[in-house]
């Protein structure tokens, strides 16, 4: 997917935690200089001896690589701490801005002689285009979005990517595909809003009229797509099913259930995805809860499974039903725990049964047609030939599939906007009005932080960063709180003023400090370079510098992964 390199501000991982960020890719990187000695000195006796610097113009993947390194360095700061519950709290914060309308009142705008515009941004700009075949807004031109009729293309504004909106690149990691499409899926968040001129209707944008955001005309949504499809055609959208992963308000969630009896969409945070053996080891959720496969029986070509949720050894919820890996599933929701069982089978001798499942906690329930948070109602989103239609029903069929969820603003109109104003979108993103000398710039922005608690080995995706708790180093007597380092931008650091060793993420093209080193002949990294870890000894006010880079963002990410493995 195309990624704009100019908008993301910073991603930092900190708080009271012992965690490292999960990175993927090969662990091998070319080493230049004494990289091992540099890595060994990064943290000594619990003290951090490095600053981490990422380029202001870096791609999002470089920023996440910097956050990954910061998280690993932070984990090394901990020598002892409370180990009573075997988990840790991680804070992930991020900021970003979309493109903007430089001056909504400019008479030169294509929409200047109109009185409404529809603004759209998403986690990736592949989803945002208005031209034929380019994105969700293109599909919606002249159609219905929620219950709003989208205007012609001149009044639909592609604000491209708001990069700290969340996306899930693999929405079906277990390959369940219960509708038999033989497709892979992805999912992404988007935000949209309608800006109107103040009434009367004759007050057009080019008259400098007051602006307003009206009830029912601001939106947050999470939509599912077939892989590498971006919403410009009806066939691009993917039907939600239990077990699918989608982002919701910045965190990757599992669709646990579309409850058609009570019209609920139930989501949960994954804690386990795999197979549980009948009368084998129960899956321990902590706090006295465990999941048990009590029995698996053959029923013709399918199987029936008896799955139980235990609390302190006693059954508190259970289901015994047919499952076949082809649409017949078992779902259990009890308090804040959600379980989806997709398939079951027996060993060759018929001695033991097995059940494939995903287990979730921190269950979130959206009551469709009702306020999820103050002034924001929850809806299912159905993909039809008429557009993306809101629904207060959880019913989803092949003909009229539910392809996402949305929150719609139902508060009072926000009007008489002539000066600086920020409109909150679901307490998550913002629509920002910035007036300067009679010009009114408009854009989406985010400045958000999420606290997540992880058990050892658990990973989460939050605000487009993937975090994994590798280990907890502690004793039960004393807790030593620490704060992990936060990656700086190159504009906030310099070689001449460094008082610690520096880790520079990104090569000379995107990191100005790396460019300084390259201009001095201290490093040699270009677009053809492999994943590289290069030390420039004494190059920063007498301190050493480690450049983590490669010829492209994937090679830079691979170099970061190699460094994390060394720390």
Curated annotation (Swiss-Prot):
A cellular component term from Gene Ontology for this protein is: S-layer
Spell out the Gene3D superfamilies in the cross-references. Answer: 2.60.98.40
Which InterPro entries does the annotation name?
A: S_layer_C, S_layer_central, S_layer_MJ
A Pfam short name? S_layer_C
Q: Which UniProt keywords apply?
A: Cell wall, Cell wall biogenesis/degradation, S-layer, Secreted, Signal
The leader peptide range reads: 1-28
Reading the lineage from the top rank, the first entry is Archaea
Q: Does the keyword rRNA-binding apply?
A: no
**What family is reported?**
Belongs to the Mj S-layer protein family.
Name under which the protein is recorded: S-layer protein
Q: Which organism is it from?
A: Methanococcus vannielii (strain ATCC 35089 / DSM 1224 / JCM 13029 / OCM 148 / SB)
Classification from the root reads: Archaea, Methanobacteriati, Methanobacteriota, Methanomada group, Methanococci
């Amino acid at each position: 997917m195309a990624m704009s390199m100019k908008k993301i501000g910073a991603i930092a991982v900190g708080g009271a935690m012992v965690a490292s960020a999960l990175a993927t890719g090969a662990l091998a990187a070319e080493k230049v200089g004494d990289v091992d000695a540099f890595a060994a000195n990064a943290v000594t006796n619990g003290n951090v001896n490095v600053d981490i610097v990422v380029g202001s113009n870096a791609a999002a993947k470089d920023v996440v690589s910097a956050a990954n390194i910061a998280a690993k360095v932070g984990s090394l700061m901990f020598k002892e701490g409370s180990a009573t519950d075997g988990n840790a709290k991680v804070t992930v914060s991020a900021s970003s801005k979309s493109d903007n309308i430089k001056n909504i009142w400019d008479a030169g705008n294509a929409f200047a002689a109109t009185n409404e515009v529809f603004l759209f941004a998403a986690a990736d700009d592949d989803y945002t285009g208005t031209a034929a075949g380019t994105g969700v807004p293109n599909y919606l031109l002249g159609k219905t979005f929620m219950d709003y009729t989208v205007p012609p293309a001149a009044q639909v504004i592609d604000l491209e990517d708001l990069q700290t909106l969340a996306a899930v690149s693999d929405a079906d990691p277990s390959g369940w595909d219960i509708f038999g499409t033989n497709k892979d899926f992805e999912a992404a968040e988007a935000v949209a809003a309608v800006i109107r001129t103040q009434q009367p209707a004759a007050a057009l944008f080019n008259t400098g009229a007051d602006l307003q955001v009206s009830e029912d005309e601001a939106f947050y949504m999470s939509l599912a797509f077939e892989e590498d499809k971006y919403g410009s055609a009806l066939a691009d959208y993917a039907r939600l099913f239990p077990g699918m992963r989608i982002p919701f308000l910045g965190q990757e969630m599992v669709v646990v259930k579309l409850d058609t009896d009570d019209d609920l969409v139930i989501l949960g945070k994954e804690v386990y995805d795999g197979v549980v053996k009948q009368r084998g080891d129960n899956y321990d959720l902590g706090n006295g809860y465990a999941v048990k496969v009590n029995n698996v029986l053959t029923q013709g070509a399918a199987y029936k499974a008896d799955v139980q949720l235990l609390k302190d050894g006693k059954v508190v919820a259970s289901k015994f039903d047919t499952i076949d890996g082809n649409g017949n599933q078992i779902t259990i929701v009890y308090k804040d725990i959600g379980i989806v069982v997709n398939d079951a089978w027996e060993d060759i001798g018929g001695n033991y049964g097995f059940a494939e499942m995903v287990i979730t906690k921190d269950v979130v329930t959206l009551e469709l047609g009702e306020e999820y948070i103050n002034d924001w109602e929850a809806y299912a989103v159905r993909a039809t030939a008429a557009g993306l239609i809101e629904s207060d029903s959880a019913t989803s069929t092949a003909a009229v599939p539910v392809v996402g969820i949305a929150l719609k603003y139902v508060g009072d109109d926000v009007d008489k906007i002539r000066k600086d104003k920020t409109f909150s979108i679901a307490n998550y993103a913002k629509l920002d009005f910035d007036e300067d000398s009679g010009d009114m710039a408009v854009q989406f922005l985010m400045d958000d932080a999420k606290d997540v608690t992880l058990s050892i080995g658990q990973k989460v995706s939050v605000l487009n960063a993937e975090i994994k708790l590798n280990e907890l180093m502690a004793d039960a007597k004393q807790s030593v709180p620490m704060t992990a380092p936060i990656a700086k931008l190159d504009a906030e650091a310099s070689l001449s003023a460094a008082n610690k060793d520096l880790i520079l993420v990104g090569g000379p093209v995107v990191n100005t400090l790396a460019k300084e080193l390259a201009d001095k002949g201290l490093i040699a990294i270009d677009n053809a370079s492999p994943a590289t870890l290069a030390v420039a000894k004494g190059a920063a006010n007498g301190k050493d510098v480690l450049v983590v880079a490669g010829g492209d963002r994937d090679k830079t990410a691979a170099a970061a992964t190699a460094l994390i493995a060394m720390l």
